[in-house]
Amino acid sequence: MPRKGPAPKRPLVNDPVYGSQLVTQLVNKVLLKGKKSLAERIVYGALEQARDKTGTDPVITLKRALDNVKPALEVRSRRVGGATYQVPVEVRPDRSTTLALRWLIGYSRQRREKTMIERLANEILDASNGLGASVKRREDTHKMAEANRAFAHYRW
């Protein structure tokens, strides 16, 4: 096993249009096969649609959506004496943001709208209103953690 320790976190540059690191993270998560300009077009288009539909700042809408999707608890597998338990643990803030973005994009890709811009915009709007598949995923994660609360003493 390598002994160098974890790789250092690299600083994220602010997004050129909105000046937000959150938008930069979103662009990097939408990115597929190195096509960053396409990812930027999708994200900016989705944020513009969100602005048109709500009439508010799209970064605020995105933050509200992420707050509704971010998990506070998750379960992690822990093997104890031949049995594997699902142990509920708290989620670090950076991981909760990453998970929220991943779920938001994953469920927007599964939606039925015609373009990815529409899908992402509608998923962001749904999440900001407390609806949508990504919010349901968070609720399911919390339910799973609550159901396995008995194993919380196995935390590490």
Swiss-Prot record:
Keywords, in A-Z order: Ribonucleoprotein, Ribosomal protein, RNA-binding, rRNA-binding, tRNA-binding
Keyword Ribosomal protein recorded: yes
GO terms for biological process, alphabetical: translation
PROSITE patterns xref list: RIBOSOMAL_S7
Assembly information from the UniProt record: Part of the 30S ribosomal subunit. Contacts proteins S9 and S11.
UniProt GO cellular component terms: small ribosomal subunit
UniProt cross-references to SUPFAM superfamilies, sorted A to Z: Ribosomal protein S7
Organism name: Mycobacterium tuberculosis (strain CDC 1551 / Oshkosh)
A Gene Ontology molecular function term of the record: structural constituent of ribosome
Descriptive protein name: Small ribosomal subunit protein uS7
Record bears the keyword rRNA-binding: yes
Source organism, top-level taxon: Bacteria
Family: Belongs to the universal ribosomal protein uS7 family.
Annotated function: One of the primary rRNA binding proteins, it binds directly to 16S rRNA where it nucleates assembly of the head domain of the 30S subunit. Is located at the subunit interface close to the decoding center, probably blocks exit of the E-site tRNA.
